Regions:
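Residue patterns forming the tRNA-binding/recognition surfaces of aminoacyl-tRNA synthetases
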Residues: 4-5, 9-149, 163, 231
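Alpha-helical recognition segments enriched in aromatics with Gly/Pro capping
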Residues: 99-101, 109-111, 128-129, 136, ...
Length: 261
């Protein structure tokens, strides 16, 4: 069926016939079952594997479990049970998302991935752009009006700088061998944004280093129990990786109430 213009769903029968003819199917029958549909178009979707970027959270699994034991959970059973068991079965964090809107993955790579750069700040990106221009890869700096170190709202206007797609995708860096490096097209998991909230809200570490320890870790947070694998985890994971610390000291995790529908 490779190369045919047949619709994926319409190929089911042909695939079944082929497997039967090649004696590779034990039994073929129709079976009614639930199937994922696009929430926007209400059309059936097809899942297939993609290459992704991961954070190796498994390397800190035991430490995250230890730090979790220092948090005061209400109810305690959520911390030791639902959240604690989640940490015990922790897998690496799939960080990348194949979408358009969101925080771009700040990773640039050569075509053969022999060299990869992860950019950690606007200042670093500006320096890399200048290197690219000097090497003849880029013609000009699209952020030339942006002033590094100026944290004013005027300086951060979209007229001076916009780090979202499609603008950031036009930036082509240069490798140590002079080869062009293009940004990975994926975005960052939006839950990473949520977990980075304690730092992002005060623009840490680029601003407000003094006094940051007075408001972090948080004394108290509260959210629904459904955030066990969402906000609670991403706060805990990022704090563990960055500071070997908890992100919050006390937490109330409320239950959920649903009506009959």
């Amino acid at each position: 069926l490779v190369g045919s213009e047949m619709c994926i769903r319409d190929s089911d029968i042909d695939i079944a016939v082929m497997l039967k003819a090649e004696n590779k199917a034990f039994k073929i029958e129709k079976h009614t079952h639930s199937y994922p549909h696009c929430w926007r178009t209400d059309k059936p979707v097809l899942y297939y594997p993609l290459d992704s970027w991961f954070i190796r959270t498994t390397a800190l699994r035991e430490r995250m479990i230890e730090l979790n034991k220092t948090i005061r959970w209400k109810p305690e059973s959520t911390g030791t049970g639902r959240f604690g068991k989640w940490l015990e079965g922790l897998v690496d964090w799939n960080l990348s998302r194949s979408r358009f809107w969101g925080t771009p993955l700040p990773v640039w790579a050569t075509e053969d991935y022999s060299e990869v750069k992860c950019i950690g700040s606007v200042e670093e990106l500006m320096a890399e752009i200048e290197r690219s221009i000097a090497a003849g890869v880029m013609q000009e700096n699209p952020y030339r009006n942006f002033r590094v170190g100026d944290m004013s709202k005027e300086n951060y206007s979209t007229e001076n700088i916009d780090l979202h797609r499609p603008y950031v995708d036009s930036i082509v860096l240069v490798s140590s061998k002079g080869e062009p490096m293009r940004r990975e097209s994926d975005l960052i998991d939006v839950w990473f944004d949520s977990g980075a909230m304690p730092y992002a809200q005060v623009h840490y570490p680029f601003e407000n280093k003094e006094g940051f320890g007075q408001v972090y870790p948080a004394d108290f947070i509260a959210e629904g129990v459904d955030q066990t694998r969402g906000w609670f985890f991403t706060l805990h994971a990022i704090a563990s990786m960055l500071f070997d610390s908890v992100a919050f000291k006390n937490i109330i995790s409320n239950g959920l109430v649903l009506d009959k529908n």
